Amino acid sequence: MRARCGAFALGVVALQQQAALPGAAAWAGGALAFGLCVWLALAWRGGVRARTRSIGFCACCCAAALAGFGYAAARAQWRLADALPAQWEGRDIVVTGAVRGLPSRDANGTRFLFDVDENDARIARFPATLSLAWYTFGRSAASPPELVPGDRWRLRVRLKRPHGNANFGVRDAEAAWLARGIRALGYVSAAHDAQRLAGRASGIAAMVDRLRARLRGRIADALGDAAHRGIVVALAIGAQDDIVDGDRRILRDTGTSHLVAISGLHVGMVGGLCAWLAGGFWRRSGYVGRNWPLVVPAQKVAALGAIVGGAGYAALAGFNVPAQRAWWMLAAAGVAYLSGRSLAPSSVLAAALGCVLIVDPWAVTSPGFWLSFCAVAAILFASSGRSAAREARDLDEARGSIDGACRERASPPACPARWRAACARARMRARRAIGRLVRRVRDAARAQFAVTIALAPLTALWFAQIPLTGPLANAFAIPWVGSLVTPIVLAGVVLPAPLDAPAYVLGEALVAALMRFLEAAAGAGRTVWMLPAPGGFALAMAAVGVVWALMPRGWPLRGAAPLAWLPLVVPAPLAPPDGTFRLTALDVGQGSAVLIETARHALLFDAGPGPEASNAGERVVVPFLRARGVRMLDTLVVSHADSDHAGGAPAVLEAIAVAQVVGGL
């Protein structure tokens, strides 16, 4: 199963790297190849000879890869068909539908998703989901009304097809919109014509959205303008829109951003709590005159409780990719236990991988997918073979304790000897407790080491940096958030108002203490290693180095594994040759940003729009410079004071060292 799920995932990844969807000839060839692979797998996989079985196994994996490629292509073709006709771009259309998700408010208005039921343009394949903005223009303009998830509206909107900036090393916005099913962007063009309709959207998704909105409102009422309210909201319902930029920077520079996203740690904790509650209630059913454990074992009820509880919390988090991965692993292990089967942890991870990609084949385009699955895979790989040794060691200790107790009872000693025996037993228990504590700390350190080196190449690929303080910061932050902050915040989620307010206040205070520690760690000298975006060869060599380093003790030349990282950490220079220059005009929308490079110098002409517009300085220019490996600009030239040209300069000056600034202001 592991190989088939991996091959299926490889096919999905291959499709997402294509510039165009396959045509009719490719579909015909793929179907023929798939049928041939299935025939070979069925005919030769059960053979007696090892070579015959190997051919059948390879054919089965090829069929799985082709199935993944074809499935992702079919899903993409179906979704791309829901496109806004070009002739309707920039024209007013009246749409009727419901608000979906959590609206986001800022100084310019409100942004929200809108599920369309009807449109007056009578377009048959109209985009099912729109990303809309309800702007506030001028001082006299009225603020947008409060938009509640599930409320139905009739709006006059002006739409356009999704179009993102195309730049090297910058997040692909179009892929993100496609993954979320957003096939048109726009704004409310006539606010006075907006009409709230009777009734609400039905369904589980709408109910969950309304619950998330109520919880966010309760947290806002309890915390007000608290500095770290956004992190509390993120831990409670998975919405990260309210996290301030300063907190985001500290979390990013210390490698702890994963802690404020509801991930496997939180879903597993909630699932374990629900399993404990369900199993405990089932075992005590005799107190109410029921013998339910005789009908269904309490262990199976606990497994079912873990699945249901984990699903509820993952839904509350918006079912992001890490939460999906954790819940599918929980569900796979729970279903296997309920059916009387035992699955290896790697098989559980493989099942979760296949389920996530079947539900959302675009998940491979998000950093969370790779970081989440690779982190768990690294932990499983690093701990493989050690759990059996640990169990044998614990069994030997238990046998020694039992033998000692039996010898002690066989010949009762005198009173002083009894005290000496009691002291000896106490010392033995203390040694065992200290030994268990040391082993747990060692196992936790080994897991943290595995995650750190496994995610470093991916962090360099996605964020063009490696946080050097990540291991130290995570060693403190993970137990702090997992054992203190998250349970307290979840207690606030469960408690009714106003009993929830003290929990949220205490959770915010604990977050504030954590952020002070992380801020000190981030400010302790050079804590972030900036690297250019690695190429395919550097990533492949780094992956080999990771696997090599995580091999068991005694593996040949295990200490030489860091040599495979050299192409990643000491990349080839990207500057143009001597005597030449390279000019790159960045796609920043309205405005300009041009990078001019020579063999030893770099000049940036304009920095694009600022936060009042598309914020291209922070979203486009800075990530591009980091991905290109530009650590210092010799000159920043600002042509004139227009915000489309000078608005992004503060973001560049804050993120990149600049020798001189020349401006026509």
Task: Please identify what each model-predicted range represents.
Residues 215, 235, 263, 318, ...:
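Conserved hydrophobic/aromatic pocket- or pore-lining residues that grip, position, or stack substrates
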Residues 24-34, 371-372, 474-479, 533-538:
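Alpha-helical transmembrane segments of polytopic membrane proteins
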Residues 100-104, 368, 588:
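Feature for secretory/organellar precursors and membrane-associated catalytic proteins
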Residues 1-83, 90-92, 203, 207, ...:
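N-terminal leader/targeting segments
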Residues 98, 142-145, 149-152, 156, ...:
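Non-globular, low-confidence helical/coil segments that flank catalytic cores
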Residues 204-222, 231, 239, 247, ...:
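Hydrophobic alpha-helical segments of integral membrane proteins
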Residues 53, 57-258, 396, 401, ...:
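Membrane-interface helix/helix-cap signal primarily in integral membrane proteins
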Residues 3, 11, 186, 239, ...:
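Hydrophobic alpha-helical transmembrane segments in multi-pass membrane proteins
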